[in-house]
């Protein structure tokens, strides 16, 4: 029986976050340039977005471009920016009733990229299905630094007192404040680390790591991750007896 058949359709994770890793190594195995891998990875993005929408995932957050990725070779960054504009298919989003959002330091993106993304956000704003969130020019340390800076400014001007700064207050000042924390974090490509991604939000997320490079990640592997998630007991610091 395939994992597509095994999963419980009534217990799909509300929020799935993915670190899409392995494009470059996938291309290298085939004697191709890294950009070839990124192009193949973009095709996988389209498929997984549609799979998530059909399964009823409420939020799908994809680690698309980190703040550290700006340090990559200039030609690779330029190719990624061009691919980003071309790969956001508004028609697919509208067909699947998908709402589009972005988190990250987007002011660093090229103007034409910002304009294209803003149009897509505006045009899909009233969609009520899966919310697709791209983490662009994003890192958790950047996000938390921005939140601390905002809160420190409010404290300096006397708008808040230190006693008002709670877990919830900090969460409200993060770029992800419009969605719940991830239930499941998936990382492809064989690496076992979080790479500065949603560190605050993934405090109690279930983690799934697989060796599959992102271009080869398909619906079966996606459903395997969901199945593994469904086999786990989420305790959030409590005992099994407390949550049963």
Swiss-Prot record:
Comment on bound cofactor: Binds 2 magnesium ions per subunit.
Cofactor names: Mg(2+)
Pfam families documented for this protein: Prenyltransf
The keyword Cell membrane belongs to this UniProt entry's keyword annotation: no
Keywords recorded for this protein, A-Z: Magnesium, Metal-binding, Transferase
Taxonomy, superkingdom: Bacteria
InterPro entries, sorted: UPP_synth-like (IPR001441), UPP_synth-like_CS (IPR018520), UPP_synth-like_sf (IPR036424)
Protein residues bound to substrate: 22-26, 34, 38, 66-68, 70, 72, 187, 193-195
E.C. numbers: 2.5.1.-
Residues given in the record as Mg(2+) binding sites: 21, 206
PANTHER family cross-referenced by the UniProt entry: DEHYDRODOLICHYL DIPHOSPHATE SYNTHASE 2 (PTHR10291:SF0), DEHYDRODOLICHYL DIPHOSPHATE SYNTHASE FAMILY MEMBER (PTHR10291)
Annotated function: Catalyzes the condensation of isopentenyl diphosphate (IPP) with allylic pyrophosphates generating different type of terpenoids.
Self-association state and partner proteins as the record states: Homodimer.
Listed name of the protein: Isoprenyl transferase
Organism: Bacteroides thetaiotaomicron (strain ATCC 29148 / DSM 2079 / JCM 5827 / CCUG 10774 / NCTC 10582 / VPI-5482 / E50)
